[in-house]
């Protein structure tokens, strides 16, 4: 996204665990739904339990693993080990999880969320701009978008500057 003269892009950042395109149930028209990480509730009927934790977490899918041990070699703090020919992941270890996930050729290790700047998120949203001309737009969902209120407000302002209709799905939880 290129900024117009006089436009200021904020440096606030937030954690997003998914961006769904061509959503038709999250507001009027065809929408892009941006899922914020973090929710203070633990509803039994939660449709997005991967969004409950505020911080990104490493995911391991054993069925994808080919036991190449690249992750074990990339692990500096012992967060990934091979025990009895099985990969063991200690999510509490202080590791550079992004670097470890990057060396996994089969994506058996991945992060459940990514950090986005406002500019990067708006860039992703604008990939669907053609659908916003008539009645679509972007819906911010979660998790709970208001847990990352500074990031949400900056995103809302940036979308307004671009003429993108916005909606928020929320439990109305705020700090």
Language model features with spans:
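Iron-sulfur (Fe-S) cluster-binding modules
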Residues: 1-13
């Amino acid at each position: 996204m290129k900024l117009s003269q006089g436009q200021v892009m904020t440096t606030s950042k937030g954690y997003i665990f998914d961006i769904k395109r061509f959503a038709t149930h999250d507001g009027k028209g065809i929408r892009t739904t941006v899922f914020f990480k973090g929710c203070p509730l633990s509803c039994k009927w939660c449709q997005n339990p991967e969004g409950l934790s505020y911080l990104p977490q490493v995911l391991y899918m054993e069925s994808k693993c080919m036991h190449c041990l690249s992750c074990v070699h990339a692990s500096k703090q012992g967060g990934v080990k091979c025990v009895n020919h099985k990969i063991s992941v200690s999510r509490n270890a202080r590791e550079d999880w992004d670097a470890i996930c990057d060396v996994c050729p089969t994506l058996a290790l991945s992060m459940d969320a990514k950090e986005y700047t406002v500019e990067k998120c708006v860039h992703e949203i604008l990939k669907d701009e053609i659908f916003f001309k008539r009645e679509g737009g972007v819906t911010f969902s979660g998790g709970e978008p208001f847990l990352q209120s500074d990031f949400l407000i900056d995103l809302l302002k940036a979308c307004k500057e671009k003429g993108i209709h916005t909606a928020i799905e929320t439990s109305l939880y705020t700090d």
